[in-house]
């Protein structure tokens, strides 16, 4: 694992502005710039492997290759996850980031288009330590992509304008009120 110190910014949105349009961009924000209590922010994008599940239907995408099959989602994720330990003082170097939905382990009928599980396997990350006021770029191997990230992190203007305009769409419920009440009552 490689680790390079990069320029520290109190507001990690600076890095997010450059990365947000990348595939599967993730920003685990400690909200330190608002609360003063969070310590670490973690940013990454472009995972080398993406796994989404809908019940036992598994979709695996690695670069331009993809496959779909039925299996136990956790067994498949374990096959791709590298459990080797890395000696580092950082909370994350590379690995899996994603979500496990509430219905991921329930045998319910799929009633929406949102996956039960969506995880990416990332081989690089920007780690911002607000306590030490340091930022680090960690990565497996130096590629052209990583070289561009290093350049952006160290040679960027700190007066970047943050995009505060967002487009919202109408909220659409994926279940009826009666079905919702029935499900909550069951719990």
Q: Residue locations for each model-derived region?
A:
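Signature of the chorismate-utilizing enzyme
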Residues: 1-187
């Amino acid at each position: 694992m490689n680790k390079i110190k990069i320029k520290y910014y109190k507001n990690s949105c600076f890095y997010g502005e450059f990365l947000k349009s990348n595939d599967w961009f993730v920003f685990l924000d400690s909200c330190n710039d608002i609360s003063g209590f969070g310590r670490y922010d973690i940013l990454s994008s472009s995972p080398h492997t993406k796994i989404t599940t809908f019940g036992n239907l598994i979709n695996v995408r690695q670069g331009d290759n993809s496959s779909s099959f039925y299996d136990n989602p956790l067994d498949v994720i374990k096959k791709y996850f590298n459990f080797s330990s890395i000696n580092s003082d950082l909370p994350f170097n590379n690995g899996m980031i994603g979500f496990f939905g509430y219905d991921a382990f329930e045998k319910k009928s799929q009633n929406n288009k949102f996956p039960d599980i969506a995880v990416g396997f990332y081989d690089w990350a920007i780690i911002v330590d607000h306590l030490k006021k340091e930022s680090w770029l960690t990565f497996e191997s130096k590629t052209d992509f990583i070289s561009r990230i290093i350049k952006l992190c160290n040679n960027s203007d700190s007066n970047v304008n943050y995009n505060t305009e967002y487009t919202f769409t109408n909220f659409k419920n994926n279940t009826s009120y009666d079905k919702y009440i029935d499900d909550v009552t069951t719990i």
